[in-house]
Amino acid sequence: MSMKKILFNGLGNRGWIGGLYYLKNIIFSCLQSEEITKKYRIVVLIDPEHADIFTCFGNRIDLRIYDGTNKVKLALYEMNLIWLHGVKYCYALELNRIGSLFASRGIFWIPDFQHKTLPEFFKPEELARKDVTDRRMTELSNPLVLSSEDAKNDLERFYPEHQCKVQLIHFVSYIEPELRAITPKLEHEVAEKFGLQRKYTYLPNQFWKHKNHVVAVKAIELLKKQGLLADYDFVFTGNLKDYRNPEYIDELKKIMEAQPVAGSIKLLGFVERTEQLCIMKNAAFIVQPSLCEGWGTVLEDAKVLDKAVLLSDIPVHREQKNEKCVLFDPHDPKALAQLLVETAEKADMPEHTAYFAGDMEKGIANMYREAEAYARGLENIFV
C-alpha cells in the first residue's frame, strides 16, 4: 500500500519569499521525525522559479513543479493531486475556492495577527479580507498552527470564540546547505560585488513599514551628525517597496539619500539567499528593529550563524531571543544609536573577536536539536 501524503502547496506564497522559507523550515522539522517519515511522504507543489528552495531535500520529498499561472488548469491539477494521489493533509491550506473543497484535510497556519495589532499599516479592504480569512480558519475545528506564544495570546484576544485546535510550533531556519556553500572565495566575491570592504552592521528585512527600518535610519542619522562610527557602514537588503505605505518609503529615502547618512548606507536590494547569508556571516552584528513578527526568520538565521543581534523589545522577541541578543526600545532612535556605539566598540576589542565572529558549527548543531524538539509538535498533528 502506498504511503499517505502531506501536501505543502507553495504556489500560494510565490509573492512572499518568507512564506516559502517557512514551509521549507517546517518540512525540515518533519524530516527529523521518524514517526512522520515512516507514515507519510511529503509532497511540495511549487513553481519553477522557486523550486530551488526545496531541492536541498533531494529524494526525501516529492517535488511537483507546476507553473500555476493558468488558474483553471492549476485548480484541476490540485484537485487531481489531492483526490487521486493519497494526500491526507494539506499544510498551511488556504481557504480559497479550491482550498475550501479540501477543508477537512487542512492544517491551517496564521503567521501573525499584524492586521489586528498594527491596523494602521493596512488599507481598509486588505484589513477586511484578512479578517474574513483568519476568522474562517478559527471557526473550523481543524488544527491551527501558530509559531509563538505571542501569536497564541493574540488569537485568544481577537478571536476568543475560536473552535480551532491550536498547535504551537516554533521553527528553526534550515540554512545548512547554503552555509556549507560559503567558501573564502565566495566571501571575497560577495564583498567585491557589493562593496563591503569596511566593517558593517546588517539589517536584512524587506522594507515593509512594520519592519521599522525608520528607527534604525534615524539612529544612524543621529550618529553621523555626531561624527560617530565613521569607520562603519550600514548594510540593508530587501526590496525598497511597501505598496501599502509608499509615503513611508519616501520618508526613509529622504533620510538615507541625504548627507551625512548617504555615504554610510548601502542599499543592496534583493540578494540571492546564499549571498544574503554570506553578508550576515561577515557582519559585525545584526540589527532587527521589527514591530511585529510571528516567529522571526531573521533571528533564526542569526542563531544558526551564532551572531550577536540588537533586537527590538517586543513580546515575540523576548520569547525567541538567546544569550547573544540585546533588546532595545523600537520607538527610540536615540537609545538604539547609543547601543550601536556600545556594541561596535565591544566588537572592535580583540578579546571579543570570537564572540562577534560566531561559531557556525555550534549554531548548526543547535539548529538540529531544536528542529527535532519542534518535530514533536508536528507529530501531534500527523501521527
Model-assigned labels for residue ranges:
Residues 1-383:
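Carbohydrate transferase catalytic cores enriched for Leloir-type hexosyltransferases
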